[in-house]
Regions:
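Sec-dependent N-terminal signal peptides
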Residues: 1-3
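Sec-dependent signal peptide cleavage junction
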Residues: 5-22
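Polybasic, proline/glycine-rich intrinsically disordered low-complexity segments
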Residues: 17-46, 50-53, 59-64, 134-224
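N-terminal export/targeting and maturation segments
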Residues: 17-130, 135, 224
């Protein structure tokens, strides 16, 4: 009887161990692929709440803006700049999706990147105002080895209330901050055979502001 109990108990322990090992292996596989990473619920809710609060700060500007007659709302560069003026009071980096838009409080973002280049840990939140009047909250975090991006996107929903479109947490595969002020990075993305078509995870953000003259020349000669 005693031996039987020992055998059953030992079998249960082995089963639990195998289940634990299987879960650890799955967690490792998720971390290795680098995308669709799990997000701590507290961190996630804080990011969502902050994103909604920021949207509400811009609500009056959005409501009075000329949004045209199309179902796909597009606000003017002037409206995006008004929103940027409001958000820059938070003393955080803010950009708009307008071509050659200068980043408000860019030195905060630059300081984070300079520290990361020296393998110093830190994080920074960057807000991007989109053409539909919504925003993206981009939180970059550097842990001393890898850089991660927690992205939250919000749009205007029913009755002009903020609505969260997505929350994603991704490891940045490679990144570089150039002498000319460009921050380029490539996110970890699904690859073949998981997907049949290539997914482009690359992005580039202008950090250092351009002079007014340079911006005007760029607008006339080049359009990104």
């Amino acid at each position: 009887f005693i031996l039987g109990c020992f055998f059953i108990g030992n079998t249960k322990c082995k089963g639990a161990d195998l289940e634990y090992i299987s879960q650890e292996t799955a967690n490792y596989a998720v971390q290795e692929r680098g995308y669709d990473l799990p997000v701590d619920e507290v961190v996630k809710e804080e990011a969502i709440e902050d994103c909604k609060n920021v949207m509400n700060q811009m609500k009056a500007i959005y409501q009075k803006a000329d949004k045209g007659t199309s179902s796909n709302v597009v606000v003017s560069e002037t409206v995006m700049e008004e929103m940027q003026e409001v958000l820059k009071e938070k003393n955080v980096p803010v950009i708009t999706s307008a071509p050659y838009s200068n980043m408000a409080n860019y030195s905060k973002m630059e300081e984070f990147l300079f520290r990361a280049e020296q393998d110093l840990t830190g994080d920074i939140v960057l807000y991007r105002i989109n053409r539909d009047g919504g925003i993206e909250r981009l939180k970059f975090n550097y842990d001393g080895t890898d850089m991660y991006l927690l992205a939250v996107k919000a749009v205007w929903g029913m009755n002009d209330n903020p609505s969260i479109v997505y929350v994603s947490y991704t490891r940045i595969e490679e990144w570089k901050y150039t002498e000319k002020g460009w921050f380029g990075y490539t996110l970890c993305v699904p690859k073949y055979p998981e997907v049949s078509e290539a997914v482009d995870g690359s992005s580039m953000i202008r950090i250092k502001p351009l002079s007014d003259e340079c911006r005007e020349v760029s607008k006339r000669c080049v359009y990104l």
